[in-house]
Regions:
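A short helix-loop-beta-strand connector motif used in the catalytic cores of GNAT acetyltransferases and
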Residues: 47-60
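Conserved acetyl-CoA-binding loop-helix of GNAT-fold acetyltransferases
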Residues: 89, 95-108
């Protein structure tokens, strides 16, 4: 399992996260049918919020030589439940434990209720987020389908809710 560093994104990280964002949105387009803007970019208001809104936080995961392995965006830091809004691991690091290590560090920083959304069609995400919920809450987590606001033609998102009531051991078990 690779050694990773997980930390809050700083202003200097923004160009790197913007590049990773393009990869993330490209991956997600398989499930949401989204096309890039005419200039080749994708919607990025969530990315902007991670750097500009105090109720949001961006995280970066890096490996040896500070090479990027992924990022996460959390919203509702002051709300009743934190929402893991966006989560991305570069393809070469998927299924290597990077995602579980990263989410463990992030969730441990914000104990309490959490929610994460993903698409039923994304079988890898389905397995991963159910495993994450079980790691943190045992069998005490819930799953529901919620329509996507403004997109009635898309299948509903799957939302998992769990509570991280204590500092979680960041070593995957």
């Amino acid at each position: 399992m690779p050694m990773i560093s997980v930390r809050r994104a700083r202003a200097a990280d923004r160009p790197m996260v913007e590049r990773l964002w393009l990869m993330f949105r490209h991956d997600m387009s398989e499930f949401d049918g989204g096309l890039p803007n005419p200039d080749g970019t994708f919607r990025a208001e969530w990315l902007a919020a991670a750097f500009e809104d105090r109720n949001w936080a961006g995280y970066v995961f890096t490996g040896p030589e500070d090479r990027p392995m992924g990022f996460a965006i959390v919203r509702s830091l002051d709300g009743p439940a934190r929402v893991l809004n966006s989560f991305f691991v570069v393809r070469s690091m998927r299924r290597a434990g990077v995602g579980l290590q990263a989410v463990s560090v992030i969730v441990a920083e914000h104990p309490g209720p959490w929610e994460v959304a993903f698409q039923d069609a994304n079988a890898v995400a389905v397995r991963f987020w159910r495993r994450v919920a079980t790691e943190f809450a045992g069998s005490d987590w819930s799953e529901e389908r919620r329509g996507i606001p403004g997109k009635p033609d898309l299948p509903p998102d799957v939302w998992i809710s769990f509570t991280a009531a204590r500092r979680h051991d960041t070593r995957p078990g």
